[in-house]
Amino acid sequence: MVFCKGRGGLHVSSLQFEIGEIRSTLPAVAAYVYAFADGSSGMRDVLGGKGAELAEMTSIGLPVPDGFTVTTEACRAYLAAGGTWPEGLNDQVSQHLSGLEERCGRRLGDPDDPLLVSVRSGSPVSMPGMMDTILNLGLNPRSVEGLARSSGNERFAADSYRRFVQMYANVVLGVHGDLFEEAIARSKQARGVKADVELDAAALRELAEEFLAISRAETGREFPEDPREQLDGAIQAVFASWNTPRARTYRRHEGISDDLGTAVNIMQMVFGNLGDDSATGVVFTRDPSTGERVLYGEFLVNAQGEDVVAGIRTPHPIAEMQQDFPDGYRELEQAMTTLESHYRDLQDVEFTIERGDFYVLQTRAGKRTAQAAVRVVRDLVSEGVIAQDEAVQRVNAAQLDQLMHPAIDPGAEYEVLATGLNASPGAAVGRAVFDADTAEARGRAGEPVILVRWETTPDDIHGVIQAQGVLTAHGGMTSHAAVVARGMGKPCVCGVESLRIDAGARRFSVNGTTISEGDEISIDGSRGLVISGAVPLVPPQMTDDFAAVTAWADEARRLGVRANADTPEDARRAREFGAQGIGLCRTEHMFFGDERLPVMREMILARDEEGRRAALDRLLPFQQSDFEGILEAMEGEPVTIRLLDPPLHEFLPDLEDVDPSDERLRSRIKSLREVNPMLGTRGCRLGILHPEIYEMQVRAIVRAALAVEGSRAEIMHPLVAFATELRRMRDLTERVIEEEGGGKLGILIGTMIEVPRAALLADRIAPYADFMSFGTNDLTQTTLAFSRDDAEGKFLAQYLEDDVLSRNPFETLDDGVRALIERTVESARGVKPGIKLGICGEHGGDPDSVEFCNSVGLDYVSCSPFRVPTARLAAAQAELAHR
């Protein structure tokens, strides 16, 4: 059933017969158009998320305005043909439009009582605010008069027309939106009013005429008056919006395929701006910031839906609707209960009340913070709605990084400049910037920034991604800034009405304080605070909800999860986050302390082996102490210690910093200099050339393991390319273990796989290894011939922008590296079935890479401590997906 609003008021229409008629008269071409009553939520790939859920809501009897959906297939065909409609699409749109007009008793463009429609995008994967929408389509100078007569409200008709001209000219004709906003500002100033809603019918009619003139001047042609021409242009514009820079940027950040395309939804307009008995709003079935089971959202009286999400006006909390619209609020509560019960998940719903009649315009799974995500699924399990395994699969593993966000130190003193809406939790410190381009540039350069705007728009997405947080003067909890920030885990404070932004001067003032671009500020998105200067932050505390969900994940996963940690403090943090051991402990970091570096340099500068051994004897106690601390922190879990890897010159000062008279040091620095040190004298090559270095490290490990009861040390040799290298290093390691009386400790000896030759010939190396660990950072560099620093600094961003690469290979495992890993697993286990295999690059915390590691049968992944929860959840999801 669908709800049609025609001359006889709201009525219900059955479409089954009509749909059959339409289908029978269509030519034998692809079905590019579906009525809302002709689809279901299972057709997301065809109808897009919005269209599929409109169809689903129609089927369960919710009051959804009538309409139809142009499919994603039509979009893909249109884009592939360079902007030409595929065969049959025009006829199908015409027939479905005729059916809509007949059911609603109104005609598009009718001069007496016109049918108006909205044209909205709908990707198969939610992309809030990234693509285009046009409202009130079908208006022209004649039909706007008919709308005024049929509605009995001249102001409403004039407002609808100026909105349509503004949207259509911007979205379809490409006229810059600022030109219209400037005209509105001039009109308000001339009439001495502050808000758009204070402009009367005459002012709005004048604005519509001015908008038409702006469009004519900017495009060099008349604004289209024919409703079908308007509709065709709008459909094409929505198709084209799939490839706008902001949409592509969002997809790249969220890992969404560029090949999906967007559907287009054409829906009968219902109006929240007909007067004080009309309203529009956005509401969530649960709080998307905390997960609390309470209606969360906002509404505006006498407004259209875009006013809420665009943040142009700061709306009212949804609870106030109970007093203003008691009947509408009851219908809203019923609809929200129905929707959450049907979808078994938190829903994000758009609604409109038109002269007392309640309509649902959209539902989708609500974007939520990680904190809310774990609470919602835990509550749904407690309520008996979903099972534990489904709860684990529901949480976005990559999103768990958000739970690692710091908070403001409770003991800190600071000056609160202003308060706003706590739109997205977490605290952020950075320098104020006032446009998205600056935020992107400074953020990419490694500078923490806070993006400050009147309100954000979808075009700001590239700046939001690079900023530490977002601060806006306008907009509410469901505005674009709030929704996008929550989805990305960025702290956000919205609706700070006391904020006075001077974009030209690049500064803002609030309550007597002026903050200029580059000044440090802090925001607390959990409490809605804007703070002067940089405040100290403290690490996050894990919640009971988080602990419950990750415990369920541990029950489901096969893959072990370890952490990369070089200090006892890192090791303790890793244990707190659930790490089952240390997969990579880098020993070189231990040589840089104030007491240690001079001794390390003394060892490097020694003239002979005797001198080196004397210096190493002084370094040994430092190493042993560090290893004891890490082994104690891991409480019997395995600790894989990598022997010295970087070239020795890294421990010496730069040549230009050395006193010219110090010839000995200058000579040694010059002798160690290499053209390509990454492929030079490093890793196990150091152990072969200077075995005394590795002997000292192995002694320190064995002595530490003997001192810490129940410890499980493992020794890993880096950069092995040849079996003969590992054989010699194993002989050295076993000899020292025996000399130190560590034979009964069961210390495992293994190697990193970070050179393609080692991966290709792993069957030759495996006999000498108890375990192999893929060093995927270096393996990616050696496989792709990419220097990470040079690639990320010079060309990688352009490769991603131009789709030469779809993903950053240093974040997600490249297919070539995956092929080498698969080859290694097969060949190593072919000669040594029980060999332990894992990875220890940062890829170990990337959900997509974790899924691959699970699929090829690795035993564990290892990542930074703060990514351990993500890896635990991703490992469980990978296992559950294959059950």
Feature-to-residue mapping (PLM):
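ATP-dependent carboxylate/acyl-activation modules
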Residues: 29-32, 40-41, 162-166, 229, ...
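Phosphate-interacting basic helix/loop segments used at nucleotide- and nucleic-acid interfaces
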Residues: 93-111, 218-228, 245, 325-348, ...
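Terminal amphipathic helices with adjacent charged low-complexity linkers/tails
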Residues: 70-78, 178-205, 299, 345-416, ...
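N-terminal beta-alpha lobe that positions the nucleotide/phosphoryl donor
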Residues: 13-265, 410-454, 500-507, 511, ...
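Conformationally flexible catalytic loops at phosphate/diphosphate-handling active centers
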Residues: 436-513
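Conserved phosphate/anionic-ligand binding catalytic regions in large, soluble enzymes, centered on
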Residues: 45-74, 116-144, 164-167, 172, ...
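Conserved alpha/beta-domain cores
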Residues: 120-121, 542, 552-883
